[in-house]
Amino acid sequence: MQRSCNEKEGKPKCSEPKREEEHPYGAFEGQRLEGNFRQRLLQSLEEFKEDIDYRHFKGEEMTGEEEEMERCLEEIRSLRKKFRALHSNRTHSRDRPF
């Protein structure tokens, strides 16, 4: 008669797949993945609520906000130009140490 894997010479020679009950961390991994999913779900729900709130604005309110946003973007562009100019002046002054 053939012996099972565990009975041969007192040592297991063939590898049996471990069950989830034997992995103490398996349950933790499942909970962690579920927690991540739950966090992502809650975050997407909050973002959706914010999007819905913005859709209810009147056209006049959105126009005012668009103008303010455009003004802020223009200010950012001008500041970037200034920083580039300052940076290029600084690098040019390093090149010529007169």
From Swiss-Prot:
Q: What is its main location?
A: nucleus
**InterPro entries, alphabetized:** TF_A-like/BEX
One GO BP on record is: negative regulation of NF-kappaB transcription factor activity
GO cellular component terms, alphabetically, are:
nucleus
Q: Which residues form a coiled coil?
A: 59-89
**Subcellular locations according to the entry:** Nucleus
What range does the record give for the signal peptide? none
Which Pfam families does the record associate with it? BEX
Stretches of Basic and acidic residues bias are at 1-24
Where exactly are the transmembrane stretches of this chain?
none
Keywords per UniProt = Coiled coil, Nucleus, Repressor, Transcription, Transcription regulation
Note down the stretches annotated as region Disordered: 1-31
Say which domain of life the source belongs to.
Eukaryota
Functional note: Plays a role in the negative regulation of NF-kappa-B signaling at the basal level by modulating transcriptional activity of NF-kappa-B on its target gene promoters. Associates with cyclin D1 promoter containing Myc E-box sequence and transcriptionally represses cyclin D1 expression. Regulates telomerase reverse transcriptase expression and telomerase activity in both ALT (alternative lengthening of telomeres)and telomerase-positive cell lines.
Which family is annotated?
A: Belongs to the TFS-II family. TFA subfamily.
Protein's recorded name: Transcription elongation factor A protein-like 7
Q: According to the entry, what is the taxonomic lineage of the organism?
A: Eukaryota, Metazoa, Chordata, Craniata, Vertebrata
Q: Gene behind this chain?
A: Tceal7
